[in-house]
């Protein structure tokens, strides 16, 4: 495993663009995906859908070459909500910040996790199966909502 220092922890580099992901592929043991794509017109970042995440994962795998089996993939979960009204509010709040195809089906946005703890845990398993993501980062304001999901996802 690669680390920034011989006895140090594995290096994690996270990003979305080609340049940073190439650096990550060359040096990191853990490669994180932020899940937000820069608008081509210089506008605000947009939450990516599954297609965009798949493209980024494929790009990284291509850049890793023979190192692919040595590297763990990480995804930043931007927000976690329960089901019902909480999920609806989450998706409506973030809909303007999604790429167009993801806004049609906000539940397909990999970085937003909503639903019952069982459904959310199943979603994490789906992301692992489909994209090979085995490491998830959750922001502090979603940690309590994530706790029952974690218990079911193990």
What are these regions (language model features)?
Residues 1-154:
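Active-site-adjacent structural elements that line small-molecule/cofactor binding pockets in enzymes
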